[in-house]
């Protein structure tokens, strides 16, 4: 019986291995992690991450051919294929700080694999890593191998949180990169045979190691680029009276462009986009390609601009001051159908409003209060490091931030409300009830274009929607730069 072990029980490792176990009942799959609370959660009825469909998959396989354990060395020792899905956060200090990927956890995992292994293994990069990381990992394994043969493969994930299980069931493609040697090709075939249990062979793409590693960074950079492009267009639409939704539809019907990732918003977030673009920028700079680096820098700059522009619009619309005013924040996760708050635009918007002395009342259906408070108190880039290493700001935010359990409580007596996550439930709220319980004039700032602005204006709201023609009230406010 083939045994697969995955080091790292996070957003990638857990769901990926759960689906692999479901589709390959004859293969034993073990997910290991040094975090005992996380493993205990995977073995409980309350999983550590929220993902539609994940709970059903885990329940079908757990205890049969899917296991979760803190005994990392034991299961690595017993496995034939080892997936490494540990964090590769952005470095916070030293060479490349703020851009380069921190491979500390990856190197530690590689050294442990070499130390405990007594038989040949296929080691699979599942984490997103800089191009040519496999070469460094190969050297670590080879120099510590004690004669054992290791084959390194790159098998990047292309999951979207909120649809991860669907993406795993029906992937656009599976990408496997390996060495162009007999042993390397044999390793590629072994992993391809695993995926072929449910993925059509023609959708399994095999490349060299470096192409696979760079393809993941490129895919995320291209997606983020589209978001920044439409967000830059949203600013121009507001200035000219055009409607970004109509512009995006007209552009997206061009078959060369397509409609996906053309929804204007308050900005992109999540664990990958910004981190991977910063990594790509650093790689370009290290390879003497400043023009290429500057191109990708602009994608991040536009994203930051969009968040600042939104927060400034809130302040300027409300008589240029939000000091002491209650503002409801609807949605804190970086997108709907996930509890993930990593790099969510809500953090920057909330912190900017707090800096202007606003009082925030925050509601998100999946994000816990502890997480929200930690995010608003944390130094940048620390979110992807272990909790003991996270630096929390000395100044507290408790007096200005209140986390509540429903949207109606959040909006009661508020001067304005900001929609920062596109949760479906926000579309069906009783906005007449909300309006009646808010201070007047009552403002809605829709950062996701999910509410019906026409109906809200009929109720009496002053509405700002990203990239849409401005209310006459908003046109009279100071320009937002």
Swiss-Prot record:
Pfam families, sorted: UDPG_MGDP_dh (PF00984), UDPG_MGDP_dh_C (PF03720), UDPG_MGDP_dh_N (PF03721)
GO biological process: UDP-glucuronate biosynthetic process
Disruption phenotype: No visible phenotype.
Gene3D superfamilies to which the protein is assigned, alphabetical: Cytochrome c1, transmembrane anchor, C-terminal, NAD(P)-binding Rossmann-like Domain
Active site: 272 (nucleophile)
KW Coiled coil (keyword) present: no
Keywords noted in UniProt: NAD, Oxidoreductase
Protein name (Swiss-Prot/TrEMBL): UDP-glucose 6-dehydrogenase 1
Protein species of origin: Arabidopsis thaliana
Organism taxonomic ancestry: Eukaryota, Viridiplantae, Streptophyta, Embryophyta, Tracheophyta
Gene from which this protein is expressed: UGD1
């Amino acid at each position: 019986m083939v045994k697969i072990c995955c080091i790292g029980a996070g957003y990638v490792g857990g769901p990926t291995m759960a689906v692999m176990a479901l589709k390959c009942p004859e293969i034993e799959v073990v997910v290991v992690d040094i975090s005992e609370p996380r493993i205990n959660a995977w073995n409980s009825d309350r999983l550590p991450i929220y993902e539609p469909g994940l709970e059903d998959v885990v329940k079908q396989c757990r205890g049969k051919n899917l296991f979760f354990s803190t005994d990392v060395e034991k299961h690595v020792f017993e496995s034939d294929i080892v997936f490494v899905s540990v964090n590769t956060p952005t470095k916070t200090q030293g060479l490349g700080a703020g851009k380069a990927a921190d491979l500390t956890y990856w190197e530690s995992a590689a050294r442990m694999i070499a130390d405990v292994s007594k038989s040949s293994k296929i080691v699979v990069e599942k984490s997103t890593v800089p191009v040519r990381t496999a070469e460094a990992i190969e050297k670590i394994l080879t120099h510590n191998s004690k004669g054992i043969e290791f084959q390194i493969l790159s098998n990047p994930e292309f999951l979207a949180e909120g649809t991860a299980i669907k993406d795993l069931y029906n992937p656009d493609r599976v990408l496997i990169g390996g060495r162009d040697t007999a042993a390397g090709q044999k390793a590629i075939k072994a992993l391809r045979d695993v995926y072929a249990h449910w993925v059509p062979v023609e959708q399994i793409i095999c490349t060299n190691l470096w192409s696979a590693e760079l393809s993941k960074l490129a895919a995320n950079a291209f997606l983020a680029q589209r978001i920044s492009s439409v967000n830059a267009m949203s600013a121009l639409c507001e200035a000219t009276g055009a409607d970004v939704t109509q512009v995006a539809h007209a552009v997206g019907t061009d078959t060369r462009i397509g409609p996906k990732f053309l929804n204007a918003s308050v900005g992109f977030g999540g664990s990958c986009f910004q981190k991977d673009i910063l990594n790509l920028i650093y790689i370009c700079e290290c390879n003497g390609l400043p023009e290429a680096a500057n191109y990708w820098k602009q994608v991040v700059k536009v994203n930051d601009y969009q968040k600042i522009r939104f927060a400034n619009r809130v302040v300027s619309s409300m008589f240029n001051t939000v000091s002491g005013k209650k503002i409801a924040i609807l949605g804190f996760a970086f997108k709907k159908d996930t509890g993930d708050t990593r790099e969510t635009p809500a953090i920057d918007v909330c912190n900017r409003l707090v800096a202007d002395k606003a009082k925030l009342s925050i509601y998100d259906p999946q994000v816990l209060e502890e997480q929200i408070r930690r995010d608003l108190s944390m130094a940048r880039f620390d979110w992807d490091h272990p909790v003991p290493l996270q630096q929390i700001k000395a100044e507290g935010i408790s007096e200005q931030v209140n986390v509540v359990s429903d949207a109606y409580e959040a909006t009661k007596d508020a001067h304005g409300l900001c929609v920062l996550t596109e949760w479906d439930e926000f579309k069906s709220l009783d906005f007449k009830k909300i309006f009646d319980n808010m201070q007047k004039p009552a403002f809605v700032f829709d950062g996701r274009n999910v509410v019906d602005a026409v109906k809200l204006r009929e109720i009496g709201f002053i509405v700002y929607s990203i990239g849409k023609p401005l209310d006459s009230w908003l046109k009279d406010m100071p320009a937002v730069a």
